[in-house]
């Protein structure tokens, strides 16, 4: 065999990858018979809207190293690829295309819009899988799955009905995170926070005359209770004032009432452990309809939930007509003016505030009461916690177990419905339902649905449970935890044995990589310039015990030089063996 003098990565890698594909050895069914004991990795399915970024490249390289090592060791290896339908992300992408045409999804209607998304998916949905092939990934492409293919959809429907028949899925009204632009509910894990300069407004709530039995001798009764808030517009929905039970300043006021400014509704003063005595004056407004912590307080004190902000972030409900229909920021200005006019604004203070943003469109999130579908989480969380604590599933590095345990310990029922058009329709909601299922509901079934569940298949018998999950820290709760309890609930065993949490790839300066911020690095450019092997080597070379990576292209250059050395060494050996009497082995 003659090896060219110059190493041309593109020519060599394309030729060798095509030989691998032709051999069929990425498919475990076509491996030699000596490969009996299975070894399985399921690729975390990238969004159909996605293109390869450095995080994908690192994760795919880690998985490929593991799968190739086990294949060489004689294991029956399955590395199963696929993509996620990515409900909100995909819908936002198509809506942007429609906007360029001067249209909205409402102009098309639900069914035509879904047809448009399917057409887009067929055209662009496999781009990232093609890029993974360019990276050299040895997945079994014949088993590629999509989270909305026919068999996968059957699994999602079966899982929903299973939970529903157990009484674990219910429909109810609760405050939820809501995106006014996407017009859908979001989980806490689907929100990004942006710190901004804001204000704290100190508002006087007139005290209802205190009953004589609670007055302390020699103490002058207060006229007002001063409350600090960063969102005065929500005060129209207040149903209580809360203080910490250990706060001596307000001990004699617990159980009394104040008059809600501008509304003139009597609301009680309650004691609750959630109140931070160091925030503002130590007395806080309780607005159960528009704050998730306030909702928790309301459950303990049997407080009403009043809706004063609607799905379009406008004021609504039984409030003075001068505020109704105003956007929240406009209402805030008007309310502050009126409080000043009535002498009920004590002071204003500069304050840094974390603003919740939609993770897809970055619109400011509103918490609003809404009818949604929920999955009870208490029993599922207990199952998952027990299994992880038993040591039957191991996290690497181990410190990431704490993220999982903290979430499971403080678990809340999961809002599984979304008010979008692209996704799995809720099985019992009837034709053309208003809601679809949260994308993570279907993603939670990935280890079992891809192997054939709810049917008993050869793949599920041979390859479940899988061996390794390699993923990122930011989806431990969104995805990893949910796959764990889904595997236990539906298959009776854990879906994987080891969880590798990869480091985050940062810029050389330590900043987050982002194409939109101009700090992203395109792995495809590196592959084109240096080759896939050099890119893989350069990325993996920087991994150090789970610590985040400050990426530098110098390591890819080093990888290229290493590939050259291997090439030249191989060429030298081949030249020498050609001169000798040693026969090459095929």
Question: Which stretches of residues belong to each language-model region?
Answer:
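Short beta-strand-centered aromatic/proline hotspots
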Residues: 267-273
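N-terminal, positively charged nucleic-acid-binding surface of large information/translation enzymes
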Residues: 1-210, 219-246, 287-300, 304-319, ...
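A glycine-biased structural micro-motif
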Residues: 252-255, 321-332
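Short conserved beta-strand and strand-loop elements enriched in small hydrophobics
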Residues: 203-205, 256-262
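Short beta-alpha connecting loops at secondary-structure transitions
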Residues: 104-115, 316-325, 519-524, 548-555
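Conserved active-site neighborhood of enzyme catalytic/cofactor-binding cores
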Residues: 47-81, 96-98, 179-181, 190-206, ...
């Amino acid at each position: 065999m003659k090896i060219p003098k110059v190493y041309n990565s593109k020519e060599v890698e394309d030729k060798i990858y095509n030989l691998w594909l032709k051999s069929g050895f990425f498919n475990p069914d076509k491996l030699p018979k000596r490969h009996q004991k299975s070894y399985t990795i399921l690729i975390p399915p990238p969004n159909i809207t996605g293109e390869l970024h450095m995080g994908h490249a690192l994760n795919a390289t880690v998985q490929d190293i593991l799968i190739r090592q086990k294949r060489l060791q004689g294991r029956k290896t399955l590395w199963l690829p696929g993509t996620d339908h990515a409900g909100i992300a995909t819908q936002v992408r198509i809506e942007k295309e429609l906007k360029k045409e001067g249209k909205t999804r409402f102009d098309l209607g639900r069914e035509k819009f879904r047809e448009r998304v399917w057409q887009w998916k067929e055209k662009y949905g496999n781009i990232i899988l093609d890029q993974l092939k360019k990276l050299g990934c040895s997945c079994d492409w014949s088993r590629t799955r999509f989270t909305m293919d026919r068999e996968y959809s059957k699994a999602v429907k079966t899982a929903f009905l299973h939970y529903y028949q157990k009484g674990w899925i219910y429909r109810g009204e609760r405050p939820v995170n809501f995106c006014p632009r996407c017009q859908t509910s979001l989980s806490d894990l689907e929100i990004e926070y942006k710190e901004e300069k804001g204000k704290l407004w100190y508002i006087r709530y007139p005290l209802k005359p205190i009953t004589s039995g609670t007055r302390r001798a020699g103490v002058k009764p207060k006229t007002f209770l001063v409350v600090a808030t960063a969102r005065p517009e929500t005060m129209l929905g207040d149903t209580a004032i809360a203080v910490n039970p250990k706060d001596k300043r307000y001990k004699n006021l617990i159980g009394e009432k104040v008059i809600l400014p501008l509304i003139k509704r009597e609301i009680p003063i309650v004691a609750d452990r959630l109140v931070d005595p160091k925030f503002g004056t130590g007395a806080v407004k309780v607005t159960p309809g528009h704050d998730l912590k306030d909702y928790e307080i309301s459950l303990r004190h049997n407080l009403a939930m009043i809706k004063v902000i609607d799905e379009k972030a406008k004021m609504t409900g039984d409030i003075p007509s001068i505020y109704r229909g105003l956007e929240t920021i406009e209402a805030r200005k008007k309310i502050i003016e009126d409080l000043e006019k009535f002498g009920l604004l004590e002071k204003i203070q500069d304050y840094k505030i974390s603003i919740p943003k939609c993770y897809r469109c970055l619109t400011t999130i509103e918490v609003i009461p809404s009818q949604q579908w929920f999955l009870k989480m208490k029993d599922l969380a207990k199952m998952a916690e027990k299994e992880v604590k038993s040591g039957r599933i191991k996290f690497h590095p181990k410190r990431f177990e704490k993220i999982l345990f903290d979430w499971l310990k403080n678990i809340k029922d999961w809002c599984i419905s979304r008010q979008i058009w692209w996704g799995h329709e809720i099985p019992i909601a009837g034709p053309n339902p208003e809601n679809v299922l949260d994308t993570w509901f279907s993603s939670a079934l990935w280890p079992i649905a891809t192997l054939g569940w709810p049917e008993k298949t050869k793949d599920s018998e041979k390859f479940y449970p899988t061996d390794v999950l390699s993923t990122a820290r930011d989806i431990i709760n969104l995805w990893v935890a949910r796959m764990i309890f889904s595997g236990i609930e539906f298959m009776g065993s854990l879906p994987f044995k080891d969880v590798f949490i990869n480091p985050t790839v940062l810029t050389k300066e330590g900043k987050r990589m982002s194409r939109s911020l101009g700090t992203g690095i395109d792995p495809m450019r590196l592959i084109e310039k240096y080759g896939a092997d050099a890119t893989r080597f350069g990325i993996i070379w920087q991994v150090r015990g789970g610590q985040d990576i400050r990426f530098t292209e110098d390591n890819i250059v080093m990888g290229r030089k290493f590939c050259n050395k291997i090439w030249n060494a191989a060429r030298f050996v081949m030249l020498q063996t050609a001169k000798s009497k040693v026969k090459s082995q095929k």
